[in-house]
Amino acid sequence: MMVKQFDHTLDVTVSVVLNLDARLPSGMARPLMETCFSMTRGVCEMLEEKRIQYAFCTNARAAGQTGPWEFVSDGLGGAHLSTILEGLGRAACQATRSRDTLLDDVRRRAESGRAHIILTPGREDISPAQVRALSNYTGAKVLVVSAEEVTAP
């Protein structure tokens, strides 16, 4: 009989991706982008609590950001989280590049086995084909969380 055991030597890594290139009417976009900032903070804090290394990638513009912001490489701990939180605190509700360019960059940086959590304002922002392509490339799960779905009544 074979028993499948969890391999504790495997490092779980995650990329947290914040997209602000939304397909929403302008009146709806800003509040949903603000919700995305909160969701991103919550996801990063949860990964910190679980001691899971994570990278961060975004297309959000950050006013006066002093350090790296659009891509923060794998890390864990207070300094890593602070870099991301500082950017979220300075973030404007404006994208620096398209969602397609962002996801192309994410896919180029992706590694086999790396999971992805994509946070986005609208339900329609990320296509199923984009999710499938990233999942097929890494062989890992891709979770898309839309602020529109989270805040829906």
Predicted segment positions?
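Exposed, interaction-prone extracellular/peripheral surfaces
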Residues: M1-P153
